Regions:
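Crotonase-fold acyl-CoA enzyme core
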Residues: 91-202, 235-236, 241-244
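Amphipathic alpha-helical segments at domain termini/boundaries
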Residues: 1-14, 18, 163-195, 205-214, ...
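Charged catalytic carboxylate motif
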Residues: 29-33, 82, 89, 188, ...
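Acidic-histidine catalytic/liganding microenvironments
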Residues: 20, 44, 93-94, 236, ...
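Helix-loop "lid/cap" segments that line or gate small-molecule binding pockets
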Residues: 158-159, 210, 214, 229-234
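Terminal peptide-recognition signature
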Residues: 15, 19, 34, 52, ...
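Glycine- (often His-adjacent) and acidic-residue-rich active-site loop
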Residues: 3-5, 32, 46, 54-89, ...
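Conserved CoA-thioester-binding segment of acyl-CoA-metabolizing enzymes
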Residues: 1-55, 88
Length: 258
């Protein structure tokens, strides 16, 4: 039995963290199942966009405290490296990932959402990095991604106070881009995913890569990445199709991921 469900809807893969009795808390097995799902998505040429969500009333309530409570320092580091490396794989996936945050996104759950490319949330969603209240630091990238997304001052406030915020404040600080009624969330996530799918897959993938790489370097180096990606696209059949459709005033496009 896998704790991460994989479902395809056209060119969209929907991954659901499915451990609702534990509010989808991340233990070692859930992390391994997520890693396997990422590999499945990467290998499937039909998948162009991923939507990640949680079963029940939680996105991911955090790492599993029941598993962590008796960790040694060595165990803790190994668990952090394990989760952190999987989240980095998700972040570096060639296909865009949309987090549809349906409920609690705390600790490791907030970190998982931040590893996604686009975050949208239910009005009932809750966000936070409450680890210092448990005597630990964020362990799956929270100290690195949160300040990059919301700025250093706000990240310090959220992490050092262990404050939990609602969806409206998460949107206000830029942690999520949109907030929807709970019953609308998945429809809106799929609508967004399909809007991305309508574009040239190689161009979408290269654009994601440039943004991600650019966030880690200076503008000059990032611009060099962009120029390389720009050139790569001119060697694709999809560039020919896209520009031909524009010149021919043709609304329908047939992108082949080539």
């Amino acid at each position: 039995m896998s704790f991460v469900k994989f479902e395809k809807q056209g060119n969209v893969a929907v991954l659901t963290i499915d451990r609702p009795e534990a509010l989808n808390a991340l233990n070692s097995q859930v992390l391994c199942d997520l890693d396997a799902a990422i590999s499945q998505v990467e290998a499937d040429d039909e998948v162009r966009v991923v939507v990640l969500t949680g079963a029940g009333r939680s996105f991911v309530a955090g790492a599993d405290i029941g598993e962590m409570v008796n960790f040694s320092a060595i165990d803790g580091k190994k668990f952090g490296v394990h989760g952190g490396s999987i989240f980095l794989r998700l972040e570096n996936l060639s296909k865009p990932v949309i987090a549809a945050i349906n409920g609690f996104a705390l600790g490791g759950g907030c970190e998982l959402a931040m590893a996604c490319d686009i975050r949208i949330a239910s009005e009932k969603a809750k966000f936070g990095q409450p680890e210092v209240g448990l005597g630990i630091t964020p362990g799956f990238g929270g100290t690195q991604r949160l300040p990059r997304i919301v700025g250093i001052s706000k990240a310090m406030e959220l992490i050092l106070t262990a404050k939990v915020i609602g969806a409206a404040e998460a949107k206000e600080i830029g942690l999520v881009s949109q907030v929807y009624a709970p019953e609308e969330l998945m429809d809106k996530a799929l609508e967004l995913a399909n809007a991305i799918c309508a574009n040239a897959p190689i161009a979408v993938s290269e654009s994601k890569r440039c943004i991600r790489m650019g966030m880690q370097t200076d503008i000059a180096t990032g611009s060099a990445f962009e120029a390389e990606a720009f050139g790569v696209c001119f060697g694709t059949e999809d560039q020919t199709e896209g520009m031909s459709a524009f010149l021919e005033k043709r609304a329908e496009k047939h992108f082949q991921n080539k």
